[in-house]
Amino acid sequence: MKVFFAGICLFFSTLFSCQQKGEHFEYVSPGEFATLIADSDIQRLDVRTVAEYSEEHIPGSININVLDEQFAAIADSTLQKDKPIALYCRSGKRSKKAAAILSRKGYKVYELDKGFIGWKETGKETEK
């Protein structure tokens, strides 16, 4: 029994110590995202490819492809650390990666839950 208990303790201590530090970002619904981006101090970031962005995007957003090897460097030279970032991708997978990278670098990040697909499904404004 003591071995079992020790094993459980070891498992949980390992689990909690392996969590990455510094990844603090918030998932927000399309409605919350719309409220956030109504604030002119919020930076709008589309992390999809240039082709996807060119097809259609949320008005006022800038595009930095998270799959670009230089994503972090481009973001640092383009974005302001003292202003929060509201970011999105197509469905949420790439934006999670971008949110993790940016939050580790000290940015305050909000990620659009369900991405651009969720945004469009709720009838929110887009531009081409």
Question: Could you say what each language-model-derived stretch is?
Answer:
Residues 44-46:
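Structural scaffold elements adjacent to functional motifs in cytosolic proteins
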